[in-house]
Amino acid sequence: MKKKLVVLGLLAVVLVLVIVGLCLWLPSASKEPDNHVYTRAAVAADAKQCSKIGRDALRDGGSAVDAAIAALLCVGLMNAHSMGIGGGLFLTIYNSTTRKAEVINAREVAPRLAFATMFNSSEQSQKGGLSVAVPGEIRGYELAHQRHGRLPWARLFQPSIQLARQGFPVGKGLAAALENKRTVIEQQPVLCEVFCRDRKVLREGERLTLPQLADTYETLAIEGAQAFYNGSLTAQIVKDIQAAGGIVTAEDLNNYRAELIEHPLNISLGDVVLYMPSAPLSGPVLALILNILKGYNFSRESVESPEQKGLTYHRIVEAFRFAYAKRTLLGDPKFVDVTEVVRNMTSEFFAAQLRAQISDDTTHPISYYKPEFYTPDDGGTAHLSVVAEDGSAVSATSTINLYFGSKVRSPVSGILFNNEMDDFSSPSITNEFGVPPSPANFIQPGKQPLSSMCPTIMVGQDGQVRMVVGAAGGTQITTATALAIIYNLWFGYDVKRAVEEPRLHNQLLPNVTTVERNIDQAVTAALETRHHHTQIASTFIAVVQAIVRTAGGWAAASDSRKGGEPAGY
């Protein structure tokens, strides 16, 4: 009897241990690991729910492109101030099977009735129908899906249709943008209809529903991209833009095509290759920054002592200044011959010549960097990074330009339209720097404006992805992307630190180095000793999403500056 009780007791103990073990193990299959390192696949978007939607697409057997599209459709709701189907995007895609990278260009174009001198003030180019360029977002999704999609097109829309209908709590990024644009939104009934409660803008945590956009997503899911460009949604889109004073026509939409770029810009940094878009995006600017800096052979030691750290950051800022001086020569290659400019900006010899002009003890006046022209700042944006189970990756940056784009929202379709026309240079709009506007970036029908976006994928010699990275934040995008790469690749910071580490930014015009509030005082002191004008950023500098290959799997980071969080499995 005693023996029987002992056996039963042991069995009970074993059973308890098994149950406890299962309880501990089972959630880990569905629960996110706290360190955001995933063994098989990862998505880093700027909203947690959107990272999860992307992850679920991967779990359902979707490709990296499927996950990116599903997540972007979600970001267009949850961070509607940054991006959406009324905007445009660029995708850098790496296929692990073929070991080839490609870029899909779905940036907006100037309408066919546009002309170089159409704007006399920034007010016109930033707000209202005239500031709207022909949206490319949905054509971009379509081309990417045709080439790399595994899941049905409609499946990619389903989670976001549900989200838009049921509503969701306003997140950190959207809440900040609503507060920033409070006056405009509260005065405009069509915007206030969705973004206000009791005629006051929604605050973080309050519920936002987007029923009209849910209907539009449903139409696109069923009818495909054609619905937007040459189908059931087209007439209303044109009507909405023209009612707000715009010049986009049905013909503009009918004629819009996303472009496949089979040989994207690439540069080598030691044993890795970086793939990124060329002009009119800022891949060449990123390439020049990194090529200038690689000659310094940065390592962990470069930031060990306050003296070394100060010198290192000074050199980084000087590289920014030289690269941004050359940025003003870039434009849409279909309209301007930028071959030689891009060749120079990606040449190690050219970078070495500029590096030789960097003085370690001082910065220089603006004229020293030889800026030939001035290009306007670009706006917000959203970035996401994806790595799928097969090792393929997508780096996607999407935008409607400034917060809430043109502020033109359709009461029927719910689409919020871009103000991408503001990214062009205008001969008649002067700037305070006394530098002429850039002719390479003047408006022409069908032309794409210059952008700071640079979605990047880094690949090792073994053909495996090492890093997927990009940023949002207007003109600060390129420097923030460069810093994330420098922090991880050269300083050896893990991905979380590479994304969270305080940043600084200098674009030559204005002649100021902006630093984040929490940056190391030694850095600011070293810059000021070298005659840099520093100022503290009013909020933060850009928003980065990155995924890095580590020994333990895919380490993913979504920038806390916008309140995002990655997902994976």
From Swiss-Prot:
It catalyses: an N-terminal (5-L-glutamyl)-[peptide] + an alpha-amino acid = 5-L-glutamyl amino acid + an N-terminal L-alpha-aminoacyl-[peptide]; glutathione + H2O = L-cysteinylglycine + L-glutamate; an S-substituted glutathione + H2O = an S-substituted L-cysteinylglycine + L-glutamate; leukotriene C4 + H2O = leukotriene D4 + L-glutamate. Changing R107K: Reduces enzyme gamma-glutamyltranspeptidase activity by 99%. The lineage of its organism: Eukaryota, Metazoa, Chordata, Craniata, Vertebrata. Cys-454 was thought to bind the gamma-glutamyl moiety, but mutagenesis of this residue had no effect on activity. The keyword Lipid metabolism applies. Glycans are attached at N95, N120, N230, N266, N297, N344, N511. Changing E193Y: Loss of autocatalytic cleavage, cell membrane localization and decrease in gamma-glutamyltranspeptidase activity. L-glutamate binds at R107, T399, I400, N401, D423, S451, S452, G474. This is Glutathione hydrolase 1 proenzyme. The chain crosses the membrane at residues 5-26. Residues 27-569 are extracellular. The gene is GGT1. SUPFAM superfamilies: N-terminal nucleophile aminohydrolases (Ntn hydrolases).
